[in-house]
Amino acid sequence: MNDVKITLLTHSKEFTKRSNTGRLVLDILGVRAEQIPWERTSPPVRLLEEIEAGGVALVYPGSSDEPESDLTGLSHFIIIDSTWHEARKIHQKSPYLQMVRRISLKPPGKSRYNLRKNQKESGLCTAECVIELLRSTGNMTTAERLQERFLAFIRPEKGPGVGEIRPTQSAMS
């Protein structure tokens, strides 16, 4: 297993949305994931220090004809946890995010997430992005656990309803 850290840079509106899938990531990954509120005027100092130290990349979509990114040497991934519209704004208004290495993932198919309007055609929700990232870094067991939780989240008849997250053992496998 490859040891990875996920930082969810979260827009303030996401903290109260029942449709936010970042909470699933925090629940399944435990100490391997953190959530930091995004603030336009005060970048998170600790995150800036980690970016400066290296091994950090922003997971952010590129053009559809870009090859999948090489993850060699990366152990810490930043994901903007917000709507696609807000994610673009956050990226544009955060010079430190524009300077960090940017990677894009090539998902095997379309997003299964349909709980929000105005979704980007080729975009993934936060949980789906982390699932693909975990798979790409060899963390298959944790990816499967997160996928199971995500599928239960989007199909309430087969598990907890939207916004209902049952506690689980949070450990990377």
Annotate the PLM regions.
Residues 15-18:
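Short N-terminal binding/cap micro-motifs at the start of the first secondary-structure element
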Residues 5, 32-34, 101:
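Conserved beta-strand segments of alpha/beta enzyme cores
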Residues 27-92, 96:
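S-adenosyl-L-methionine/SAH cofactor-binding core of RNA-modifying enzymes
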Residues 1-3:
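Cys/His-rich short segments
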Residues 8, 58, 79, 103-104:
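A structural signal for short, well-ordered beta-strand segments and their strand-loop junctions
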Residues 23:
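Active-site phosphate/pyrophosphate- and oxyanion-stabilizing loops and adjacent acidic/basic residues
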